[in-house]
Amino acid sequence: MLSNLLKGIFGSRNDRLVKQYSRIVRTINELEAVISPLSDEELRDKTSEFKQRISNGEKLDQLLPEAFAVVREASKRVLGMRHFDVQLIGGMVLHEGKIAEMRTGEGKTLMATLPIYLNALSGKGVHIVTVNDYLAKRDAEWMGQIYQFLGLSVGVVLSQMPHEDKQAAYGADITYGTNNEYGFDYLRDNMVGHSAERVQRVLNFAIVDEVDSILIDEARTPLIISGMAEGDTEVYKRVDVLIPRLTRQKDENSPGDYSVDEKTQQVLLSEEGFIHAEKLLGEVGLLPAESSLYDPANITLIHHLNAGLRAHALYNRDQHYVVQNDEVVIVDEFTGRLMPGRRWSEGLHQAVEAKENVSIQKENQTLASITFQNYFRMYEKLAGMTGTADTEAFEFQQIYGLETVVIPTHRPIAREDRMDQVFRTAREKYQAIIADIKSCYERGQPVLVGTGSIENNELLSTMLTKEKLPHQVLNAKQHEREADIIAQAGQSKMVTIATNMAGRGTDIVLGGNLEQVINRIRVDDALDDMTKTEKIKETRQAWQVRHDEVIKLGGLHIIGTERHESRRIDNQLRGRSGRQGDPGSSRFYLSLEDPLLRIFSSDRVANIMTRLKMPEGEAIEHPWVTRAIENAQRKVEARNFDIRKQLLEYDDVANDQRKVIYQQRNELLDAEQGISETVSAIRESVINQLIGLYIPAQSIEEQWDVPGLEKALASEFLLRIPVQEWLEADSELHEENLRSRIMESVNTSYQGKVEQVGASIMNQYERMVMLHSIDSHWREHLAALDHLRQGIHLRGYAQQNPKQEYKREAFELFAGMLDAIKADVTKILMTVQIRSEQQVESVAETSTPKNLQYHHAAYSEAEEEHQSVTEGHEAKQQPFVRKSDKIGRNDPCPCGSGRKYKQCHGKLD
């Protein structure tokens, strides 16, 4: 209450920031009179002037008003588009490394040109991150005209692009690309054998488009580069045949072999299920007689069985994946796009392939991985823009340290968001949806229908076809046409059905997309300039008539066929209507059979329907119901936030280790004078460690095992050092002197190798051996960390803190890996006999991984730990240092719900 009162008196922080930016906007507007009279050449020369001022010590903030005014003028001349004042505010928000929430259709793409130009002046590079190649290419070509007009270079990074082109794109002042490609290029740069093969520069400044989709929705799935591992794919087929013979439990207490927990996406075998599974596996010869699934030799069978159960019980065709060209292709659950080349990990993808009876590919070995959270936090400055960020402002602040600023709209929003209608069954719901679509079509109002899956998309399409209602279908199977379909979705009588609208990146303009049609006329070589001008004029007039007609009909009507588990995704769908003050409307149709309601709220809403004696086909429409659904969404959002936070806490451990390894790699690649000193230090450390095993520090001669030391030096490093003879010849030879003499002998032996082949070749060979050893041990270490992480949540049952145990054991594994690398390098270099330079090149060849695959892995350990915590099995928590002010129980919840903390996220504490 007090905070609301203070906000009413002094305004919110967001209001204060907008006022602060508005003062700078006035300065920029005043500069327009100075900049407008400049010729094109004079305007272009401003770029050189700004660069000179930066080199003289002037800060970017000091240049901002003038630079923004220059970009605005260039945009007017090149694109015929002038930045609104609210876009100038958004540009300042991005420049300061914050997130700008700007409603759909308000011009985020144009807004971004302001901070992009300003920050590109430093010469360190600016990365613009989009959700797909189409948008990266489109924006680079479209907005690139402004930058090129002002004398800056523009590059675009696309998947499957030649290496030289990619290096050139990253070398440009401004680079467009997808989040996946930036992340994979970073990982690939840390797998190269020569520094010249790297493509990326220093990570300076990134602006992330659809920042909520990339930094939140995809934060649970790390980027992974993997290679094929050895293994028998036939086992998946043999296990798949058995899965239908196992029965699913209807509930916890009913008979059956396994249960499915949809909330945690887990499949668990019951005791009877284990016995039945053992019997079935024995029948097909996979489990030897008199042995158990619990035997160490049969652990892989449990892995195969669990993957098969998950494939059958949790993953559905045309919802989670599609089958194309004898392959299982994953469907992105957030955007509805196909993700060819991506594969689920832990054998799940192979299990789905066996289920669908397509060719089974071998399992993968992880070569390198990173989460988007840790990749984007490496940028010196990070900013983002989206139409829906405010509901996730707390997470952006907690995880990335990014403040969210809501940018005022250029015109007031005129869209009418109607209350949800809830039906008992999906059949009744779809009947109501068809009736609403039919009503809109008959009066000419355009409709956009958002569905949650390809399956529902095609079901609705079939129903509309039966009703003889013409419509367009947009889903992951036709993403090549998606921009054209969406661009024309605002025309009269247009009915468009689309899967999840996140990241589509194309505005829906009432009356159809005028600019798209005009651009086609402009690039038509068959027309002369006069004809083009006339045709463009006619097109504008015809569009204006269509535009006014659609506005009279009420604008674009949005229909949601189900609520997503995130309110933000629902808001993205709604936000497609009512752009720049246009009229519009939206409504969600729900049923008690929808996943969200079935899992979280069906009993409560069903009781309301029963009390009201609702007849079949009648919908319930009440603020209480809408509030109950939003509460269910908040529960899921809070749970997903906890999962992402836990995943980050685990990945931070691996990230610290990754930084050390990658830094060592880069130092090796960049060492111009060779790495002889490093190799010498490693050799001394390894030999001293070996000596210590046989001649302990500060020990007397009677405790020494000299024969053992001589044997170890000979077998490990092929060194024949007469230690016993030295001791017999010199009675004054003590431990320290002996160590020095052994090391001197070792170094002399190694120096002989160097002289034999030449210092240059030996330096090259040392570098290759070090890189190969680091890479191979790092791959093994990643697998060990993965294995450790999968079972670490079970430590909670032993009254241990899983996170603390993971950190401790991961550190021990890492220390062991570093020792193994040193020993490996020393042994190879001491024992190898180099006869030609070709041998050096062969090492470089073998150290380069082949047949790489790029994908997101389905990490589930954070969810498993979360489950064990909620079931009351968490160990006693360790003390921690709070990084921010404690939130009072009666304070407003930081998630933005408007409720007290104790009644919202505080319930989770």
Swiss-Prot record:
Its main location: membrane. May bind 1 zinc ion per subunit. The keyword rRNA-binding does not apply. One of its GO terms (cellular component) is plasma membrane. GO terms for biological process: intracellular protein transmembrane transport; protein import; protein targeting; protein transport by the Sec complex. The keyword Metal-binding applies. ATP binds at Q87, G105, E106, G107, K108, T109, D507. Its EC number is 7.4.2.8. It is a peripheral membrane protein. It is found in: Cell inner membrane; Cytoplasm. GO terms for molecular function: ATP binding; metal ion binding; protein-exporting ATPase activity. Residues 865-889 have a biased composition (Basic and acidic residues). It is an enzyme of class 7 (translocase). InterPro entries: Helicase_ATP-bd (IPR014001), Helicase_C-like (IPR001650), P-loop_NTPase (IPR027417), SEC_C_motif (IPR004027), SecA (IPR000185), SecA_CS (IPR020937), SecA_DEAD (IPR011115), SecA_motor_DEAD (IPR014018). Monomer and homodimer. Part of the essential Sec protein translocation apparatus which comprises SecA, SecYEG and auxiliary proteins SecDF-YajC and YidC. HAMAP family: SecA. Belongs to the SecA family. PANTHER family: CHLOROPLAST PROTEIN-TRANSPORTING ATPASE, SECA INNER MEMBRANE COMPONENT OF SEC PROTEIN SECRETION SYSTEM. This is Protein translocase subunit SecA.
